[in-house]
Amino acid sequence: MSKPQLDLFGGQPVHASRGPSGAMMSLDERHRYLLWRKLDDEGHGVCTFVMLNPSTADATNDDPTIRSCMRLTRLWGYSTLTVVNLFSWRTSDALDLRAADEDPTGDPKNLLIVIDAVQQSKMAVMAWGSSIRRLGPLRARAAEVEAALREHAPDKLYCLNRNRTGEPTHPLFWRKDRAPIRFLELSL
């Protein structure tokens, strides 16, 4: 079965799966723009995680980070998880973003997908972690996305915590007995 193609990116081919679990990815699958998982019918709405970059998870396969996000989303009582990223380039090592042979942010419309996902959710968890500090000039992407989200959906922004250098904590090893906190109320 062929995958539906969407023209969201000015002619750049993108495919998106349909159904309770899926992803929007470039045709070559080097970029992932959006991932979603319907977890159950009992929860109340969508929880979105905004992280650094996608790893190996795709429309049907989960990686450890996605499994952690699914666990937290269920724990907090949401029915659906969506995941967006500062960078769309898929890699298991964030440092590879510096050496990508193309722009690791993907198409400029990636920011619109991030904003839309956050606006469509009841809660958005900022969670890109400390790896952003090692990305040199790419670090500016976090400030760009954060500013856009502060403008378009400030009341929906949460995080697990902030690390010593101010970045929102990554969810992979987060204890499940800790609740998310308002992102904008934390001082750096």
Predicted regions and their residues:
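Active-site and ligand/interface coordination hotspots across diverse enzymes
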Residues: 1-63
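Short acidic (Asp/Glu) patches
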Residues: 33, 62-70, 102-112
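Short hydrophobic segments within beta-strands
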Residues: 50, 84, 126-127
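A short, flexible beta-alpha/helix-coil linker loop
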Residues: 53-56, 89, 131
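A short mixed-secondary-structure module that forms the rim of ligand-binding clefts
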Residues: 55-77
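Membrane-helix interface/capping segments
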Residues: 60-61, 93-101
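Short connector loops at secondary-structure junctions
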Residues: 79-97
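Glycine/proline-rich loop-helix segments at beta-alpha junctions forming the active-site rim
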Residues: 97-188
